[in-house]
Amino acid sequence: MDKKRNISMAVIKRLPKYHRYLEELLRNEVDRISSKELSKKIGFTASQIRQDFNCFGDFGQQGYGYNVKELHAQISNILGLTKEYRCIILGGGNIGQAIANYNKFEKLGFRLEAIFDINPKLVGLKIRDIEIKDIDTLEDYLKENNVDVGIICVPSRSAQKVCDILTRNNVKGIWNFAPVDLKVPEGVFTENVHLSENLLTLSYLMNEQEE
């Protein structure tokens, strides 16, 4: 665990995929796996897999491979999944409701505690027993409750304003679904999910193949 310093973002981005495949192996009651076997499943080279894991410690044994249960636990710990994160959703429309209804996040330790929206037709509705609150009450809520992650699902014109409210109230993680790049202070971490950009990438790949 001492090797977590100066890990490249490319390696960090691959960790969730390792975690997902290791969960699948656990469900299938696989006890151990070699880097070569994992390579066939995950699509990275065996050398890349070994290099990635070596960034964090010596997980495998030569001639044995990796103990799946132990490796899964190690990756979970590296990803911070042994902790619990308090989350709120900003925007109770289609995307916000879809995220709220996806219970996989809670299994990973991300607990949804509140949903906010500006639309009076949505305020008061319940999603999985969580009542949508008026977004005008957001700042007061943040002063009274510790929140780790803000999930932004509002239109682009409102996203930065909402983000500013979150960051000045000590929210350190922003998961942004609004189609805009947010400005955040140092020490705040953002992950953007720009759905249209992914679709345009897919469009390019299909168009390139046709040519």
UniProtKB/Swiss-Prot annotation:
Source taxon at top rank: Bacteria
DNA-binding region in chain numbering: 17-56
GO-annotated cellular components: cytoplasm
Spans traversing the lipid bilayer: none
GO BP: any one term: negative regulation of DNA-templated transcription
Signal peptide limits: none
SMART domains documented for this protein: CoA_binding
Subcellular localization: Cytoplasm
GO molecular function, one term: DNA binding
Binding site for NAD(+): 91-96
UniProt keyword annotations, A-Z: Cytoplasm, DNA-binding, NAD, Repressor, Transcription, Transcription regulation
Cross-referenced Pfam families: CoA_binding, Put_DNA-bind_N
Keyword Cell membrane: no
Keyword Magnesium among record annotations: no
Stored InterPro entries: CoA-bd, NAD(P)-bd_dom_sf, Rex_DNA-bd_C_dom, Tscrpt_rep_Rex, WH-like_DNA-bd_sf, WH_DNA-bd_sf
Role played: Modulates transcription in response to changes in cellular NADH/NAD(+) redox state.
Quaternary structure, from the entry: Homodimer.
HAMAP family xref list: Rex (MF_01131)
Family classification: Belongs to the transcriptional regulatory Rex family.
Protein name, per record: Redox-sensing transcriptional repressor Rex
